[in-house]
């Protein structure tokens, strides 16, 4: 499973130590760094508000799924997730397996005035999968279970 707060998979160790020379160069160029606190997944899950969505068979509303779909992979996203400074989450996440299910979800979103965020691999670095604060509920549609493109 993909890391909830960074690149890689949960079973990968991507930890690297900076050499003393590189650390000195970075300090000379940008100043001394300040380490962020490291939040646990459970700490971030505890911050997830109640969903504003009604039950739907294709939509997951559990807090962990919502955390895992709350941000992309930009540096600001990493810093927010790593430190636990996340303030918006989708209200629900759907993982359709067919074009019929996608149509059903979009019709449901239209009928219920939901904001829809399309989610591919979750690697966005431009912020478009991050829910903005809104009075309308947010539905993220994760296309990860779709296995082909049709023309």
What is the role of each PLM region?
Residues 1-151:
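Noncatalytic alpha-helical scaffold of FAD-dependent oxidoreductases
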């Amino acid at each position: 499973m993909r890391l909830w707060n960074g690149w890689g998979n949960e079973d990968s160790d991507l930890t690297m130590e900076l050499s003393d020379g590189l650390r000195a160069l970075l300090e000379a160029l940008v100043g001394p760094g300040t380490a962020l606190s490291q939040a646990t997944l459970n700490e971030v899950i505890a911050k997830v508000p109640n969903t504003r969505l009604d039950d739907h068979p294709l939509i997951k509303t559990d807090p962990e799924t919502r955390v895992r779909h709350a941000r992309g992979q930009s540096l600001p996203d990493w810093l927010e997730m790593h430190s636990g400074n996340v303030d918006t989450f989708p209200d629900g996440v759907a993982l359709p397996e067919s074009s019929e299910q996608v149509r059903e979800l979009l019709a449901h979103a239209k009928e219920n005035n939901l904001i829809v965020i399309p989610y591919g691999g979750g690697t966005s670095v431009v912020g478009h999968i991050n829910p903005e604060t809104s009075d309308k509920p947010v539905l993220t549609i994760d296309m990860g279970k779709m296995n082909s493109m049709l023309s």
